[in-house]
Regions:
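SAM-dependent nucleic-acid methyltransferase catalytic core
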Residues: 2-22, 26-27, 71-177
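Conserved S-adenosyl-L-methionine
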Residues: 28-85
Length: 177
């Protein structure tokens, strides 16, 4: 499986090396714990039966919870965001500014998850960066190929949700902030 988001300083480069060190028995019977999951590229490549994905970033952990609990709501929200993005580049900066609103913390978790994915897909190099006040501040990026950016990724979201919800698997999320 492929990640839904890009993550700077991720473990994608080390996947093949790490896969050689982990036995199938470990993946079948052990609990895989990833304390700094980021895009979860390593966990998704390994696909353990039991895993705990953790991170300090509560918005990041929220997207995984929403992918598990409400994938269709997330996809619907992302479709709406894609259409709004195509109409105006100002839309990016409006969405980016949501975290400056004092109501952001109480915002619907699906809206926050779709915001995170939208910004990740449309900002410069998918770089998650916040300023000293904790506000997301990466500027708008451009597709280097000139092709439209796949903001929605419904196939990836559904595949990941199916894996998270498979009764043979135990997948939990922890935010350590």
């Amino acid at each position: 499986m492929k990640p839904v988001i890009k993550w700077s300083r991720g473990k994608t480069w080390a996947i093949e090396y790490i896969k050689k060190l982990i036995t199938s028995e470990m993946l079948e019977h052990g609990t895989y714990i990833e304390p700094f999951c980021g895009s979860a590229s390593l966990a998704l490549a390994l696909q353990p039966k039991r895993m705990i994905l953790g991170d300090l970033n509560s918005e990041l952990i929220n997207i995984y919870k929403i992918i598990k609990e409400a994938p269709d709501d997330l996809i619907g929200s992302l479709v709406w965001m894609r259409l709004s993005h195509e109409e105006s580049t100002d839309y990016f900066y409006n969405v980016r500014a949501w975290d400056r609103d004092h109501k952001f913390e109480s915002m619907n978790p699906v809206s926050r998850a779709s915001r995170f994915i939208y910004l990740n897909k449309t900002c410069f190099n998918g770089l998650y960066r916040v300023n000293s006040k904790g506000y997301f501040n990466t500027p708008l990026g451009r597709s280097s190929s000139g092709n439209p950016i796949d903001i929605v990724q419904s196939d990836k979201i559904r595949e990941l949700s199916a894996y998270f919800n498979d009764p043979r698997n135990s997948v939990n999320f922890v935010c350590a902030s």
